[in-house]
Amino acid sequence: MTQQERTYKNLLAHSARYPELQPRDLFKYLYQSAFGCEHLVTSKEEAVAYIQCEYESMELLGNTAVEPLDGAYCRVPLAILREGLSPKTLGELFCRSAKKEPQGREALQEKLQVAREMVLSGRFSFSSSDFDDALASWRANGFEAVRHSEEFRRAYHPAYRVISKAFVPFLPLFARLDRLLLQKGSAVLALEGGSASGKTTLSKLLEELYGCTVFHADDFFLRPEQRTAERFAEIGGNLDRERLLSEVLIPLQKGKAVTYQRFNCSAQALEEPITVTPKALTVIEGAYSMHPDLSSYYDLSAFLKIDSDYQRERILKRNTPDLAKRFFEEWIPMERIYFEGTEIESRCDLVISIADDDFSFEKRA
């Protein structure tokens, strides 16, 4: 599908969703599609305060469905806050989504051309002359950001923030975390999933959003003396889970500082002990982190499920041919045996499926 075809499809869906939209509402949609929210961000503190104030003043909460724009951004309704997402987290995502789009003007012009062709073919409720007059005025003002029309506001009561689509797959996870932290004051999260599914990237984002402590399962590889045939015959035996349990999870459960040793793959030995004082949120990320021997120590768990073709593409892009071969012939088969043998996916609280740009969620009670 070409970008023009995608724009046509998205505009068709947008007009069907909002039959009362006026030319300026169409312009706003296209502007946000091309430029995102770069023009709106002043400071993180102000962004959070505005979200809180607007949410509290809303008379109609509406639905919580995220609305895709025609590009790398989407509209997240403020009503989503009632599902547990905090104004602070949404404000953080909003600010992190604000960036300069150097190709924004060019993209906007291309989208406007598609929109005009659709107007001429009668795809919108307003006339082509109304569209052309509004477009001429908008162009004269330098294609500045516009507000929704009064007609649109009366009909639909819009209240949302524009954020990057890259954050959308993780909104249910953020909402669960925000609820947990509000209720308990602290939480331990397991990020489980296959190779190249984005666990480390997500843990870095969580660290930036929540200032959390992150422990990596890769630091608990088996030591050479543990790599026996009997050990590898165990389902999920490819992790020193005993050490992860004794050095990290049990101290966390007791509210104590964690002193542990990272396994150095190059030296094939444990490094010197380090002591970490956990924050309110602690994340354990990596395959095997939700092993049945460990799962009871978590407050929340998420499984990142990656499409096999996309997984292969990512691994080939990130690694040397020799290392990629080890992934395909050694580590991924072991992960699959573990996933199937322990039914980890079904035992996690949240499943986030990732297949290229296609994301979906399976919420669990």
Predicted features and spans:
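Short hydrophobic/aromatic beta-strand immediately N-terminal to the Walker A/P-loop
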Residues: 188-190
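P-loop (Walker A) phosphate-binding loop of NTP-binding proteins
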Residues: 194
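Post-Walker A alpha-helix
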Residues: 202-203, 207
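Long, basic/Gly/Ser/Thr-rich N-terminal segments
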Residues: 1-153
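Conserved nucleotide-sensing/catalytic segment adjacent to the nucleotide-binding pocket
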Residues: 210-216, 222-275, 281
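N-terminal pre-Walker A segment at the start of P-loop NTPase domains
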Residues: 155-182
